A protein has these predicted regions:
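Bacterial N-terminal signal peptides
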Residues: 10-22
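Middle-to-C-terminal accessory/interaction subdomains
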Residues: 43, 54-56, 87, 101, ...
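Residue-level detector of functionally pivotal "anchor" positions at catalytic/ligand-binding pockets or at interdomain
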Residues: 416-439
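Short, glycine-anchored, charge-dense loop/turn motifs used at functional sites
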Residues: 438-444, 463
């Protein structure tokens, strides 16, 4: 009997220990319900209260909630709702790896289309973790004259009475007259005349619903998520699959003088997209958050963009970003083939001359204007989430500006040149410019007064000179 009592006692102690450990683990994984940190008072504040103060735990299921926006006396910002009469919205989680962090990103859907802090009316918005990369990347989208680039506004957020820090309230990517302004194709469309346009898709690297997957080459697949339309008929699904098989086939054509891929893809938009990824040194540019859209018309093509989820690796560039190693194994799609086409390289050069250096130099003042005023809010955010307090707004601004300067100067010296360049007549305006010599990797290795001078000073090898492949013996 004594042995039985001792056994029961031991089991009880063990269970108590398990419960204690489990509760401790749970508490450690959940941020405190009430933060000891409060708003900085330097930015508008977005107050959100879910029904019954229910926690937001799902990326799929919206919770009903109410909101109000307090401008905090900032000129030009309109208040929305009041404490006594808040406005309706729905809220859920969003993101892939970002959702795993302590500070969560959110997707919100307002009760009606509303203009917030000067941004055009819409129901759909995102609350994103603020980074200097977002500030720089989205402004570069405007500088590069992309078809449409999301806007954002910094806000501090109080969720269910708890201060959760600094966020960027950001326009989400949707087909809408104020966003991706193209024809909106209906779900379950079967009319073949209407299926060929009104598409918004994303080259993705995560398994999800609403996707098709086709072989890109002998080594990896190409996965596309269709955002709009979202619920496809068999006819829509077949058209989209056939379309991207055809696009992929033309891009991977062994004949890199072919123009077949240009019948599907807008070359200029792809060149602008490429330049932006290089200036940012964003290794995710061609494998995740790589959006394409297509309008409905007889001559419509796939437009690269909008841009989203931009990072900057802040490293010394030694090659094009899509060729440089990163710590994860996702594969960049298409760009390794596209960069071999002469039409693409020429478009890159034309656009670069349009933006470099004057337009690109505008980014540095913009970064200071946007990032430095966030200092107090960023400090409170770091305290709230126990992040490094040394990451001041000034440090963040200097870091991204220094990275952009390095990337811009590197790219200016390494504009891509196709080894399959056509023997086209050099335009009159270019005849008096220095003769630039490139190796087969597309790197400029020198400038000379003439082609003859270049050839007399080069070692044995194969070079690209005046858009011609020349072998020096």
């Amino acid at each position: 009997m004594k042995k039985i009592r001792n056994f029961i006692k031991d089991i009880g102690c063990l269970l108590s220990l398990v419960i204690l450990i489990s509760c401790t683990d749970i508490e450690a994984s959940i941020p405190p319900s009430q933060s000891v940190v409060s708003i900085s008072g330097t930015l508008p504040v977005l107050y959100i209260d879910t029904e019954n103060h229910s926690p937001i735990v799902s990326k799929e299921v919206y919770l009903n909630a109410f909101y109000r926006l307090d401008p905090m006396g900032i000129e030009g910002i309109e208040a929305l709702g009041t404490k006594d009469e808040p406005l309706p919205l729905q809220i859920r989680g969003r993101g892939h790896s970002s959702w795993k962090g302590a500070k969560k990103p959110y997707k919100i859907k307002l009760g009606q289309k509303t203009s917030i802090m000067g941004m055009p009316k819409n129901k759909h918005w995102a609350l994103l973790k603020p980074t200097e990369n977002t500030v720089a990347g989205l402004q570069l989208g405007h500088i590069m004259n992309m078809a449409w680039t999301p806007s954002f506004r910094p806000v501090e957020v109080v969720l269910n009475g708890d201060y959760i820090g600094l966020y960027f309230l950001t326009e989400t990517i949707r087909i809408d007259e104020n966003r991706v302004n193209i024809y909106k194709q209906q779900d379950q469309e079967t009319n073949p005349d209407l299926i060929s346009g009104g598409w918004l898709v994303e080259v993705d690297n995560y398994r999800d619903e609403c996707q098709i997957t086709i072989p890109e080459n002998n080594q990896w697949n190409l996965t596309l998520r269709y955002h709009s339309p979202e619920n496809l008929s068999n006819a829509q699904l077949q058209w989209l699959t056939d379309e991207f098989k055809a696009i992929n086939s033309t891009i991977y054509s062994p004949d890199k003088t072919s123009t077949a891929w240009e019948e599907y893809i807008d070359v200029e938009s792809m060149a602008r997209f490429f330049i932006l990824q290089e200036v940012m040194d964003n290794p995710d540019g061609f494998h995740g958050s790589f959006y394409l859209h297509k309008d409905l018309s007889n001559n419509s093509k796939w437009i690269a963009g909008p841009i989203w989820d931009l990072v900057c690796y802040n490293r010394d560039k030694s090659d094009y970003t899509f060729k440089m190693k990163v710590h994860y194994g996702f594969t960049p799609h298409w760009i390794g083939e596209i960069i071999q086409y002469d039409s693409f390289c020429k478009s890159v050069k034309t656009i670069w001359e349009e933006v470099y250096p004057n337009k690109l130099n505008e980014i540095f003042g913009y970064i200071d204007d946007m990032v430095l005023p966030l200092d107090a809010a960023w400090r409170n955010d770091c305290e709230r989430w126990n992040e490094d307090p040394s990451q001041t707004a000034s440090l963040r601004a200097d870091r991204i500006k220094n990275a952009l300067r390095r990337n811009i100067e590197w790219f200016d010296k390494h504009l891509p040149v196709s080894q399959y360049a056509s023997l086209s007549i050099i335009p009159e305006a270019e005849k008096n410019t220095p003769t630039r010599v490139f190796n087969l990797q597309g790197f400029c290795i020198g400038e000379f007064e003439s082609e003859d001078q270049a050839m007399s000073n080069l070692r044995k090898g194969i070079y690209i000179i005046n858009n011609k492949k020349i072998k020096i013996k």
